[in-house]
């Protein structure tokens, strides 16, 4: 048993596993893979995308639109600004960029945490599976987690106004109708 633990420890102590670049590309890859496998099953992204178009067209945000998606929207009008760059792109590109940007936002917020790199690496490896699960559902919760971590970062840096901006942004974007 001890030999197995030692071999496992030795395997994972290789530089590849502790290199932030490895994790950066892994997280970008998770964004790409999740988007490429979900082109036809991305109901959450469709809801998000149509928040922008319904806001743009002045149509009600919280009514059912069964021809467009299979649920109802719960996001506030401010969310239409967040999703706009992805909504105006052709569907496959919008979905790919949405997933990659979500992964990138959380990766960068974790990398900014005021802790030693080894602990950041551990968090990134630990969260990779949860990231993939959330990406498969195109969930906005990834961005909310990044906003929370970024708010903490700015509070620690004594940039309370910037932290408050992120807290308000997260609240108004995720505001349920």
Predicted regions and their residues:
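TM-lumen/periplasm interface segments of multi-pass membrane proteins
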Residues: 8-110, 114, 130-133
């Amino acid at each position: 048993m001890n030999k197995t633990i030692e071999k496992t420890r030795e395997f994972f102590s290789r530089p590849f596993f502790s290199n932030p670049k490895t994790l950066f590309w892994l997280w970008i890859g998770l964004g790409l893979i999740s988007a490429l496998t979900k082109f036809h099953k991305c109901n959450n992204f469709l809801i998000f995308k149509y928040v922008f178009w319904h806001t743009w067209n002045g149509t009600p945000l919280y009514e059912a639109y069964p021809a467009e998606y299979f649920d109802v929207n719960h996001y506030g009008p401010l969310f239409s600004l967040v999703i706009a760059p992805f909504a105006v792109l052709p569907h496959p590109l919008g979905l790919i960029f949405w997933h990659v940007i979500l992964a990138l936002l959380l990766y960068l917020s974790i990398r900014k945490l005021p802790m030693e790199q080894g602990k950041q690496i551990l968090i990134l490896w630990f969260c990779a599976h949860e990231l993939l699960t959330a990406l498969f559902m195109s969930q906005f919760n990834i961005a909310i987690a990044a906003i929370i971590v970024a708010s903490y970062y700015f509070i620690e840096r004594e940039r309370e106004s910037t932290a408050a901006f992120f807290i308000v942004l997260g609240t108004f974007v995720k505001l349920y109708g």
